[in-house]
Every structure is written in C-alpha cells, then in structure tokens.
Amino acid sequence: MIQIKNAKELDGMRKANALSAAALKYGGEHIEAGMTTWELDKLIYDFIVKHGGIPNFKGLYGFPGTACISLNDTVIHGIPSHDIVIRPGDIVSIDTGAKIDGFNGDNACTYAVGKVDLEAQRLLDVTKAALYKGIEAAKAGNRIGDIGYAVQSYCEDAGFSVVREFVGHGTGKELHEDPEVPNYGHQGRGPRLVPGMTIAIEPMICQYDCKINQSKDGWTVKTKDGGLAAHFEHSNAILKAHTEIMTRFWDDPDFDTEKFSLK
C-alpha cells in the first residue's frame, strides 16, 4: 500500500534525507586509492552517528554494513570488507542512508577513483543523467511507467543496459515501501504519482549485458559478463507544483559537509 505523507511527515523525510545525502557526499570526498571498503564504510558510519542519525542499512535484512560499497563489475550490495582494497581507476558505488525520528533516507552515487577510461566515465555520465531524466518524469499526474521509460530509453539509446531484478521504491517510515519504481517500463502505465508520495529513483545500469549473478555471500550482485556497472539514486517527494529532490546535497558542489548540521 502506498503511504501518502502529510506536511509534518514530509519534513521528517527531508531531515533524514539531508543527513543521508551529507553522509554520502562525505564518503565520496574521502575515497582514496589504497583504503579498504571497510574503512570507507566506517567513515560514513561515524558521520551519520555524529549527526544524530541511525545508519539504516546496518542490520537491515541482516546486511552488515552502513553502506553498500560496490566496485567495478559489482552492481549493488557490495559488503564492506577489510579485504577489498580500492585501486586507482576503479569506479566505486556508495549506497547508504540514515534514519532520524522514525523516517528513512536513501541515496547512492558512483565515483571515479582518479582517472578512469573513457567508456567507464561515459557509463557514469549516462547513468547519472538518466537519474535526472527519471526525476523529470516523476511529477504529479504522471505514472510510475513514465519514470522507467525515461531511464530505460535514455540508457539504451546510449548503448547500455538496464538491470531488471532490482528497482527503486517508495520510502518513509520503512526504508522500502510501495510502490516499486523500475528503471524500465512503458509510458502511461503503473500507479499514478500524487502529491505526498516519496520515492527513491535509482538507475542500475550495465556497460554491456544486463544479466547478473548473486554471490554466495547472499548479497553481492555482479554483472554476469564482467562488465562495469553504475548506480545513482535520489529520494524524492512528489509535490503538487514540483518534485523535490530530498537528497540533492550529494550532487551540490557548493554543499560543505564539514559545516553540515541538522540544527
């Protein structure tokens, strides 16, 4: 059942997503070649807790980390590890969120570590642009299928492929709520978007084929053909006159994580 948020609940969602976005940007700013994904996860954990939040990924369905940290051919759900070292030329996806006052934030970004090859950079650029194409379609009166169509058509026109098994979702007092928000679909189909809905739009895009494999750890999802994958995500509030990107801070070059405060 889709939960429609009132004004007070939307304010709670804004707060949780502001911290989530600040934590994500902080993590991205501190990625360094030579560090482990466990070390990166710890930095994000400390940032969230320092600002009064609860890392809402940690323990969810048994996931052990504060963030899903996924390198190169790992699409999503990479488990932070002492054994995974970030190298120059890697692409690193961070997917994380924070819970405050009973409300959940959720966002993701894929970062280049130093200089990456041209095709890897193009994958990042297209996937990020597709996120904003999806958000442009996510306006009151449209339908969920309009979002998926916008993402899918943009990525496939660029020669990339869209993961089918994992999708975006509603957010709120639960991290994952209805409706599902696929990154593929047909215009004019699916639930109608109405003011008060809060949804996470998150393109998961593959360099080559979209077929995936889940690792034996039960979490890590990789491309079957070993190609690269990228993942970007914003949590959004559907309002009457516009759609608000509640996690916009992670993509704001002027946002200073060192000065961030919820007070």
Regions found by a protein language model. Give the residues of each.
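Active-site neighborhoods and metal-handling regions in enzymes and metal-associated proteins
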Residues: 1-263
